[in-house]
């Protein structure tokens, strides 16, 4: 069955016309299917594939799997966007990457939208709660191969829920109530939560300022009741080993807050983001952990601008793509990332990362990335012999295509 799903995905992907170097980089009109004489019915295929190769160089005495050089299909999405009469829209999309590793296909976005006004959008189904700037930014447009360590450590994921987003001028307000991921529907998981985010993005000088904050409250029920766990990979996804890990913590809920600050001016961007999560522990002192990152980046190619729209980073569109005899867009980025999983008697470890990256975008739909990371691990969950303080180096590259 896994092989069948993989062949279906590859067959559909192969049917999508590849961008020719002789073609313009202007988007091709979306294929539509119309009912009767109206134009409100439409359907548009969408997808992406990301292929990663990463090398993780950890001390030889650290016990872990898939260190050294490994390759993986990081994401292989296939789905459709559509519109319906009455200001309705929908998206159905699944990730087939697991099929290449004998795992299951998982739904990503599966939702229905309704726009009663130009400013308000209501969404019902599985989509992202509003955790913060980098988590809301599509993985197609992130500056590093992997998002900040806290986004995975704190369990940020898509969930089934009902939300609303109000956007007017420089203000964006998002809020919703969410349950669980579709993969957990059969796991007797009755957890639910409430998430909200506010972004103010006024013009400032020659650029745009981004100021945001988010708040989250989650009640753990069913199979998730009683424990939480926070852990993170070492700046690469090719291993399942986490060098920082709190282990299971008795808790019946979570409360967290995030803060976002960014400035985008032409080819330049700077970002500062942090998130603090508290495990709510009945009869015991609550435990709090936090993570954050600071980043600067610059597009080196003339005429190129950092993409930003709707409270998130967006696609880089080369001013001089290879289809017109240029070299595309080249961006360099530097980041400091910190994840602290120590609090009181709980010692999950401290992971600090200095990341350097380069992004090459030859045309809108193609992207190549390379990252180097130097990690400093303190109080590691997995020691190097008897030493719980050590360093790790990672190097990763990605080839990406989307339509």
Language-model features: locations:
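C-terminal intrinsically disordered extensions
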Residues: 1, 199-203, 212, 220, ...
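Bacterial N-terminal signal peptides that target proteins for export
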Residues: 1-8
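Outer-membrane beta-barrel pore domains
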Residues: 25, 38, 57, 64-65, ...
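Hydrophobic helical h-region of N-terminal Sec-dependent signal peptides
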Residues: 9-13
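N-terminal signal peptide c-region/cleavage motif recognized by signal peptidases
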Residues: 17-18
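Outer membrane beta-barrel
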Residues: 27-58, 63-221, 261, 293-324, ...
